[in-house]
C-alpha cells in the first residue's frame, strides 16, 4: 500500500509541476517542452531503476549521459537546473519559485521512499521461521484431526496448507511490489498515465 501511495503522489506532483510551469513560466515553447519531457522521463526512469532494468529506455525523451548510474537523480537535478535558470532570469517571483521547488523536491522524496521499500525486505530468519511453521502444521495437524474427522483429515489439512502457503507467497510479492508479475504494482500503466496527463496539460 505504501508503494501504491507513493506512485499516486508521483502522479499528482507530476501534474502539479506541469501546471505550475505552464502558468508561471511559459504557456508554450521550448521551456515548457523541456520540463514536460523531464517530468515524463522521470517516471519511466524510476520504474526502470526500481526494477533494475537498463536506465535508458525508448520512453526517455531526455538525453542521459551513458556514465549516469542513477537516472532519476540526474533528471531531478535537471528539473532544479531549469528552476534555477528561470529564477535567475526573473521569470519567477519568490513565491512562484518556492511553490515549484516544493513540487520538484517531492520527486526525490518519492524516489528515496521507493528505494527504501525495495531494499528493506523481510529478514531471512523470518522467512525460515514462517516456512518451518508451515511444515510443522503439515506434520502435526493430521494427527490432531484424524480421530475426529477420519478420512476428512486429508482434505481439511490440504485446504489449510493451501491458505498458509498462499499467504507466504503473497507476503513475498507484497514486500517487493515493483516487479513485472500481475500481482505487482502496475508501474507501466502509471507511467503511461503520467505521460498522458502531463502531455494534456502542456500541449493543449
Can you annotate each of these PLM segments?
Residues 1-8:
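Juxtamembrane membrane-water interface segments immediately C-terminal to a transmembrane helix
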Residues 8, 14, 18-21, 41-45, ...:
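Small-side-chain structural scaffolding
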Residues 10, 30, 34, 38, ...:
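Aromatic-enriched hydrophobic runs in primary sequence
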Residues 11-43, 49, 178-204:
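Solvent-exposed, non-transmembrane helices and loops of integral membrane proteins
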Residues 17-126:
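Structured inter-helical modules in multipass membrane proteins
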Residues 116-204:
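Alpha-helical transmembrane anchor segments
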